[in-house]
Structures are given as structure tokens and as C-alpha cells.
């Protein structure tokens, strides 16, 4: 859903009219207003932070602290979506080979998880965003993110189980 950012620019004393994007109930500001101040980075919540409908552009526009944290939250969401709670496609494995724990279904009722599981197009967008976050991490820090392997495992599982290839992001609901 596209809306306009209504944040006042402190340095210009005017209302910003740039587009912003919403996923689930997550309210994001446009790129020029976004500083991460409204975001809870704790492990208690998972979120999807979207600054652009293109998953790759959205990843490049996020600040460093989100590039570090968001691949893990993406893996946590995808592991719930792939588990018995939604698609029942199997497990996603951490860097050490152990699967993400989905037994209790943590985050399964979170609005962002529900959004991502609502259609394969939403799931595809989240996977591409997670992979783009991991790539952006590599670009900024010169090393692979700990979730890199899990994200690409999720992508391969998606191709195998959904019977779809992730190529179009404009189909996100």
C-alpha cells in the first residue's frame, strides 16, 4: 500500500510528501526521513522494513544496523512459514546445520509473518529481500552474513515446493 510520508523535515521545516510503503502493520518512513528511530531491534519482535517496493532497492536503502539484524529476522519468519504452521515445506537450517526452532510457532501470528505467508508472491518478495539484505551485508562489511546460507536454502526450497521461480516482485499483494 502506498501512502505519503507525513514526517516534518527538521532541517527544512516542511512536510515530506515522498511515498512510503507498509507491510503488515509496520510503518516505514520514506528514505530521506528514515533513521531507524521507530524500530525495535530486539529479538522479541520480527518485522519487515520496506522503503521501496523493489526488494533489492529496499535493502540498499536501510541503515547499517538493520542490514546486520534483518537477515536473521527474515530467516525466523521464513522458518515459521515453511513449517507446519503454514506451508509445511520443511526446515530451514542455521549456519551450524541445526534447524530454526519452529515447534512452538513463535511469531506465527505476527502481522508480518501472516502477510508473508498470505501468498507465494509475498513469500517470494520476502525471500528476495532477505537475500538482498545478505548481499548488502557482504557489500558493506566484506564478509558473508551468518544467515546467507539459510536464505539461499529458503530460496531453493521455494523453487522446489512452490513450483514458481522468483522473478517478478511487482506481483506482491
Residue ranges and their predicted role:
Residues 156-173:
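Aromatic-residue-lined binding/catalytic grooves and analogous aromatic/hydrophobic interfacial grooves
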Residues 124-159:
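Charge-dense polyanion-binding interfaces
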Residues 5, 16, 30-33:
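Cysteine-centered motifs
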Residues 40-138:
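An N-terminal structural lobe/cap that precedes and organizes the functional/catalytic core
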Residues 3-4, 13-15, 39:
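Polybasic, lysine-rich low-complexity intrinsically disordered segments
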